[in-house]
Regions:
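Compositionally biased terminal segments of proteins
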Residues: 1-185
């Protein structure tokens, strides 16, 4: 609560002036007992008061939550996750938004493209030797994303200042996450 106006005031922490601070904060939690996820869902919007609607939090099912927690790192007592965890989350959000759009729901195409672009950028941070095991369903979601990425001829890594082709990025992600795909080991 703002001490002068008496109104609630919320802040998004993005693009800090001091480079020692993270670029963005996301909150992750697993579903509490009182919230029932729709069958087959793993990302679920939570109805909130309009005052906090601009804040970012992601409710995860147990499988995704365990995946995040298994890769959690810590710096100065603050837990965080890196590209190895964010890539499957962004890919899953992309799959979810595309599915919802295909069903006729109003989905902003910019959000779909943002998740794809985020995965492309984050994939550049994966060290060549890194291998990240995935639960079967998370692997299936990531494979669906990679299929969609391959099929989308409008995706241009060069517009993101990346020197790889879509095919190279798909191969690198599949290799890192040990996914079974045509043309990979």
């Amino acid at each position: 609560m703002h001490w002068i106006s008496g109104r609630c005031q919320f802040y998004r922490f993005q693009k800090p002036v001091d480079e020692r601070f993270p670029v963005m904060l996301e909150l992750f939690c697993r579903a509490p007992d009182g919230i029932k996820l729709a069958e087959g869902s793993h990302l679920t919007p939570i109805p909130l008061d309009e005052a906090v609607a601009s804040l970012s939090a992601i409710l995860l099912d147990d499988e995704y939550y365990a995946f995040i927690m298994a890769g959690r790192r810590e710096s100065d007592g603050l837990p965080w996750v890196g590209e190895d965890r964010l890539i499957p989350l962004k890919a899953s959000a992309w799959v979810d938004l595309n599915t919802r759009q295909a069903k006729g729901e109003a989905v902003d195409a910019k959000n779909i493209r943002k998740h794809a672009n985020d995965v492309l950028r984050l994939s550049q941070l994966l060290a060549p030797e890194v291998r990240i095991p995935l639960a079967a369903r998370i692997g299936d979601d990531l494979n669906r994303f990679l299929d969609g990425l391959t099929a989308d001829r409008s995706i241009d890594p060069k517009s993101l200042k990346l020197n790889n082709t879509v095919a190279e990025i798909v191969r690198r992600i599949a290799q890192a996450y040990e996914l079974k795909r045509a043309g990979t080991q």
